[in-house]
């Protein structure tokens, strides 16, 4: 860097770029170099990507099974109570 700064005063840091035309000249001095081998890194702006929404059930399958079992158990209890009530009415 020191040798390059001695040959080119714009690299020494002593001379500052004062206006846009000088800036354009400095930018034109540098050329773009793409590697022929190895990874190439590209800066990219992160953007939101919309994807298809995944619909989840409000109740899990196991919860639905438990509710069905509970409902069936309540129905059988009601039927048994009705049968006992009918037997009591018949015997009285």
From Swiss-Prot:
Part of BBSome complex, that contains BBS1, BBS2, BBS4, BBS5, BBS7, BBS8, BBS9 and BBIP10. Interacts with HDAC6. The BBSome complex is thought to function as a coat complex required for sorting of specific membrane proteins to the primary cilia. The BBSome complex is required for ciliogenesis but is dispensable for centriolar satellite function. This ciliogenic function is mediated in part by the Rab8 GDP/GTP exchange factor, which localizes to the basal body and contacts the BBSome. Rab8(GTP) enters the primary cilium and promotes extension of the ciliary membrane. It is linked to Bardet-Biedl syndrome 18: A syndrome characterized by usually severe pigmentary retinopathy, early-onset obesity, polydactyly, hypogenitalism, renal malformation and intellectual disability. Secondary features include diabetes mellitus, hypertension and congenital heart disease. Bardet-Biedl syndrome inheritance is autosomal recessive, but three mutated alleles (two at one locus, and a third at a second locus) may be required for clinical manifestation of some forms of the disease. It comes from the Eukaryota. Residues 13-22 have a biased composition (Polar residues). The lineage of its organism: Eukaryota, Metazoa, Chordata, Craniata, Vertebrata. This is BBSome-interacting protein 1. It is found in: Cell projection, Cilium; Cytoplasm. Belongs to the BBIP10 family. It comes from Homo sapiens. GO terms for cellular component: BBSome; ciliary membrane; cytoplasm; cytosol. One of its GO terms (biological process) is protein transport. Residues 1-22 are annotated as: Disordered.
């Amino acid at each position: 860097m020191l040798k390059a700064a001695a040959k080119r005063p714009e690299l020494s840091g002593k001379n500052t770029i004062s206006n846009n035309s000088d800036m354009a000249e400095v930018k034109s001095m540098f050329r773009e170099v793409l590697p022929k081998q190895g990874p190439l890194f590209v800066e990219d702006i992160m953007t939101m990507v919309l994807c298809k929404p995944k619909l989840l059930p409000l109740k899990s399958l196991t919860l639905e099974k438990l509710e069905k079992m509970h409902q069936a158990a309540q129905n059988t209890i009601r039927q048994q109570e009705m049968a006992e009530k009918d037997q009591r009415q018949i015997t009285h």
